[in-house]
Structure formats: C-alpha cells, structure tokens
Amino acid sequence: MSILKIFAREIFDSRGNPTVEVDLYTSKGLFRAAVPSGASTGIYEALELRDNDKTRFLGKGVSKAVGHVNKTIAPALISKNINVVEQEKIDKLMLEMDGSENKSKFGANAILGVSLAVCKAGAAEKGVPLYRHIADLAGNPEVILPVPAFNVINGGSHAGNKLAMQEFMILPVGAESFKEAMRIGAEVYHNLKNVIKEKYGKDATNVGDEGGFAPNILEDKEALELLKTAISKAGYTDKVVIGMDVAASEFYRDGKYDLDFKSPDDPSRYITPDQLADLYKSFIKSYPLVSVEDPFDQDDWSAWKKFTATVGVQVVGDDLTVTNPKRIAKPVEEKSCNCLLLQVNQIGSVTESLQACKLAQSNGWGVMVSHRSGETEDTFIADLVVGLCTGQIKTGAPCRSERLAKYNQLLRIEEELGSKARFAGRNFRNPRIN
C-alpha cells in the first residue's frame, strides 16, 4: 500500500532538545517514528540538521529538517505511489533528492524519520512484526534476542564528573534468556547504587544522560573496581562481564591522549597511544573486560590496528566507522577493529544501516546495535537488533524510561516468540554459531 500522508513535527528528546518526529499514514493506519541525537558525535557522521537560530532553543531547533519533510520529501513520496514495503526504493529516492554526500541538504534527521516510519508501515502492510520485516529486508530466516550491554557508570562527555572514559557497561552473558539478563542487569545496577552510596555518599548516585551513575571519581580503574564489587555482591561473578566505551576522540590532543581532559589543559600529562593501549591491557588482565569501544581517536589508524592485533577482546568501532558502509571498508581491510557499532542516525536511513550491518557481518565482525545519549520513547532499535541477529545491544542503564522503552520492547518480543526465542548469551559476538 502506498503512502497517504506524511507529517513531521518538532518533539523533545531525553535531554530537552528538539528532535524530529514523523507521522506516516497508509490505509493500515498511522506509523510514528522519532529520531535520536548523540552528544559525542564522530566527525564523519551524516549531518544532523539544526536551525542554528540562537534565539530559539539555543540554536538547536529542527524546524528546517521538519520543513524539508513536510514541504519536499512528503509530496515527492506521495506522488510516486511507492508501496511502503519497498524500503530500499524509498530510501534511495530520498538520498537522490538530497544529493549530498552526508545528507546535508535535508538533514539525516529528516531522512531517517521518514525511513523509520516507512519501515514500521512496511511491517504492518505485510502483517508481520517489525523485527520480522527487518529480518526479511536483511535476508535473515531466523531472529535472535541480544545480550543487553547496560551502561551503568557514565563519564566522558555524558557526565559532569572527572572520568575521561565515557561508558562502563555490564553484559549478563551467562543468562539463559533476555528476561533473565534483564533481571541480572537490574540486580547488579541496584547493588552498584548501594556500593556507590556507601563509598561516595548519596549525591554520587545521581544519574547521567543514559541512566548510569556518575560518581565523582577520577581514575577509570576505580569505575571498573566498583563494577567488580557490585557484580560480586549481586552474586553473578560467573554470569556478568564488562564492556567499555572510551570515546577516546573526545580527549585526543595532538597525537596524544589526555585522561584528565575536563581539568585545565596541561600537555605534560598527555600519554601516547602505546601508553593508553597498555592501560587497556592492564584492565583486560585485571577485570572481566570483553569489549572496548573507540579506544583511540577516529583518525589514529595505526593505534587501532596494533591494539586489535594484540588483544583477544571485542574492539568496537563507532566514531571510526560511523555506521557508514564507505567508512567500514578501510578498517575491514586494515583489521583496525572487529565489531561495528550500529547507530541508525549516524548514517540516516534504514537501508544504509542494513548495508553497514551486512558488510560488517560478512567480514566476520560482530555488530552492536546502539541508542544515542539523546533518546526518545521510540523502540525501533529493539526490533532492529532482533531482526539483524547481531546478538548485542546497548541502550543505557535499566533506568530512565527512554532507555527502558527499548528493553521492555525486547521482553515483549521474546515473549511473543515463545519457544522459538533464541538468546545470544555467550555467543554475543557471533550469535549465528550456536
């Protein structure tokens, strides 16, 4: 069935910033999608169009992107009469109309809002759940429930503390099901809250953008120590492992790294890529650390390559790859990392997200589906991770409704699949091999 009407509006994300929401109507009803927004953004990401009118929302309005949907994209898609199940055809048309390399004409936030809504409408048109429609688009006969990576300690650009590294995550890989993984994650989270409260006081249990705690600690090792203690207190030492998102591009300075970048600048404390790599290796040795995201700057290629070759853990590219099939080719060739972070708004369309995922998987990489720090109540990525069979998702701590919206949707999907539900568990890096 073709599109009857498309209408975009400005709504608010979880940080109180405007973002784009799109309503798409077919004869089957209304399909709504909202677009997320990141805080630590890679320089190679598709352009998120903001108004830059300082008199309105401090320049962060998205009325231009909304206008592009309502005045240009909507009439074009309606007049073409394309069936909503033809995701690639519709996405291609929008990309051709935009015509720029990084979606700077309409904005990735405009194109993605429509693309997500089309995908939801396509599922309804076929009379199947969204995750099944996505699996069909990706050519996957089976679907898999992911291991959740809960970001329970926040630092970096997501928090007002001194921590340089951005996210410290727990992954309940030893769970038997997604439902059990949620319970384990929640129990560790509450134990962590008590550990932090006892050690640093009640103020230290305030939460950051993604629902994790942001205690005022300086040493990244201290964050890992807190996780180790909380996991042990919860009684899950054999079931929970640790992941990190360093977001090192945020503290890259003249070829070196500043682990105290929130203090006044002092080049004498900068460390070399090799010293930083040694720090990670010491973490891997002392803690159950199995995944490190963005350990180096997005252009520090040699450091990435060297590190990935010498550690046995998952090395995730985010700022390095920005979910862009064109940016993935080089790290695949150079073996710079071994896992893609998949964020739909970095590339700006469902079709290109699927292409990026397939390219990574076909080269033996893992894929981790991810939210952004500025989120909405939209649950698209929950269905996406199941349909793409990536086996892992990070969408914050088990706290704040915009995070739980995704986790709760995954619980519903597992329930709906019943006896057919498969949980990635310890095979989260390559869940197809069970």
Curated annotation (Swiss-Prot):
Cofactor: Mg(2+)
Pfam families: Enolase_C (PF00113), Enolase_N (PF03952)
Residues annotated as binding Mg(2+) 2: D245, E293, D318
Molecular-function GO terms, alphabetical: magnesium ion binding; phosphopyruvate hydratase activity
Record-listed E.C. numbers: 4.2.1.11
PANTHER family named among the record's database cross-references: ALPHA-ENOLASE, ENOLASE
Protein's name in the database: Alpha-enolase
Top-level taxonomy: Eukaryota, Metazoa, Chordata, Craniata, Vertebrata
